[in-house]
Amino acid sequence: MAGRQGQPSLNAKPVAAGTRVAQRVMLLAKTSEPERLRQHGARIIDNIGDIYIIDTPVTGLEAMSRERGVERLEAGLPCTALMDTTATITHADRLWDAIIPGRDATGLAGRGVMIGVMDVGFDVTHPVFLGEGGMPRVAAFWDQLDTLQTGRPVEGTDTVYVGRQYLTPDEIKAKAFSTDSRLTAHGTHTASTALMIATGQTGGITSVEDMHSRYAHPSKREGATLCLVSNYTSDGRDAVSDERRSLYTTATDILGFKYIFDRAAELSMPCVINFSEGAHDDLYESRLYCEAIERLTGPGRIICSSAGNEAYKGTYMAKPQGRERAGAFIATGSNQAFYTIASAEPPTVELTFYDDSQGKRETVAYDLTRLREYPDSVELDTINTPTSRYITAMVIYPSCYDDGRYATELLVMAPDEKTLPDAISIEIVGRENDIEVYASGGWFRADSHDTTLSSFTRDHNILFPSSARGVVCVGGTAYRTGLTNYKGEWMSSDVGREGRRMSYSSCGPTMAGLTKPDIMAPGANIIAAYNSLFMEKNPDDASRRWNVMEFDYDGRHHAWNSNSGTSMSSPVATGIIAQWLELCPTLSPSDIITIAANTATHPENDLTYPNNMYGYGQIDAYAGAMYISDHYTGISSPALPPSSTVETWYDVAGRRVNGMPQRPGLYISSGGKKLIRR
């Protein structure tokens, strides 16, 4: 289905005659007989047990999928990048010089720990990344978009895969920038945030000038080591040629995670990876991706990922059993909107097109039960209104999370327009059906054409892979409401105050019914390093107004920049976890959740924790370290707190239910969705 985040549209321009079209794609494949993959032209790049990362011809996919020994083939679209006093707020600064019971060393700075960052737009010439002698504090740098011959090939089992890698300090210093740095500065900000939180300097930071004096020069202070992977996202289409774009999928990202963990293993280091990217969750399940993540992570191997910035808009609509219908208006910034519908039985969907020029409306009803009768479970339709031509597309399949429930994907688009020209409402109908609708490419809104259609909420919008088990999902809190930029101008950015959730920080539950986020960290107006090449190539970009200081170093013009989003929250948590891994190198993802359950601060005391707004609360570096010192050093995996074993029920809006639900309907309990029948 078109309309998924980053997916080419149905109205994409036709390929010109003679244009070279991509013939190979990167996939995850599960099989105990890898030779069956090779028989169809696949090249095995790497493997995680019986999950293989392969580069294979598109023409051989159908035959490969029929092989009895091949259990599953899977590839998803690339993710999208999500966008001081932070160390003091989280108490990370107290660990920089803390006396930890039972330890000879003073302070925690991530010594002997690798911080991996897979992101876009790296600039390692910024002095925050430089260690003694002015050399980068980076153990390895894999630029997946690099086509230059100056770097080393990335050796796979049978082939040299995408990009080039840089492994020595001299190579990394000469590399300087990721290939996409002219397009984005995102990774420079996230990587420097994680590094500064982990390593710190003596004492607290009280001003931008104080931060500049501590970080704007090569540091002799010991601390965490970086490993960088520059990946492809749907934002950076200009960085990759059309014929190579199919080589960059979720399988390529798994390869990036494995690359970082492998480099850490070579150096005998525990590792925490930051991933400030995400894509909309789905109901057909990225099963192999999630299984690969679970195999890659474990003691001393942790992935932190940003929750998403989706809660500023309507993203979820529910119609409980016993109610005839629910509805809202379609909203999108493009010419198409995309929604995922989950229900025990396929419902009826009504789309109403409002023609303001003639004061008319036209309603089209789709009985989704008939989709099951079609061989390919797909239906396409064309609707002509007085103002435009619309195409609708629908596909139905069993939901991967609930036995007996269906998922229907619905696309509405105006192929001849840049935006949807008419007001369009969507209503789901069926009194006996519990129905959920997720905004997967677009959102819901209210409209004066029919004020009764406003059944949406701003939750159920945690992005993938943060929605997956085994990934530490980080939401964002806010303290600053603005700042003064390098020109002396006040820049207002009020998305929350007093440590409460940023207004747009994504909320759970996930499509699988998991309570997410797991933890919170500051994410509003976070000051960190800025990409100097991006600034050079885009001197008038609006993001430059958020520079709080600009300065020259080693022949380049650098800056400290303020940015906001859960992209910034995740590396704050990553830096703190690097401190904890120095104290106890065997911490696992489940250990991080346990520590948070016992030590995180609660921004809103009237709530029950964990919940789908804050998870277990805001990460507290110092309290967590004290807890580790008392409970974890030398202990591989203590049990979860007793309270976490109590069965708690929530409705699909995330509201807690007292005791066992008495009314029939769809509920969430024990980490999954459950249907209570009459």
Features from the language model and the residues they span:
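Short acidic, glycine-rich surface-loop motifs adjacent to enzyme active sites
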Residues: 229-231, 255-284, 306-307, 425-432, ...
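C-terminal subdomain of the subtilisin-like protease fold in secreted/lumenal serine endopeptidases
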Residues: 14-17, 270-272, 277-279, 283-285, ...
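Autoinhibitory N-terminal propeptides
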Residues: 1-105, 114, 234-235
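Active-site core segment of subtilase-fold serine proteases
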Residues: 122-192, 202-208, 219, 267, ...
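Subtilisin-like serine protease catalytic core
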Residues: 100-251, 268-272, 285, 298-300, ...
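Protease zymogen maturation seam
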Residues: 66-114, 124-128, 150-159, 170, ...
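Hydrolase catalytic cores
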Residues: 199, 229-234, 258-271, 300, ...
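Residue-level detector of functionally pivotal "anchor" positions at catalytic/ligand-binding pockets or at interdomain
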Residues: 628-653
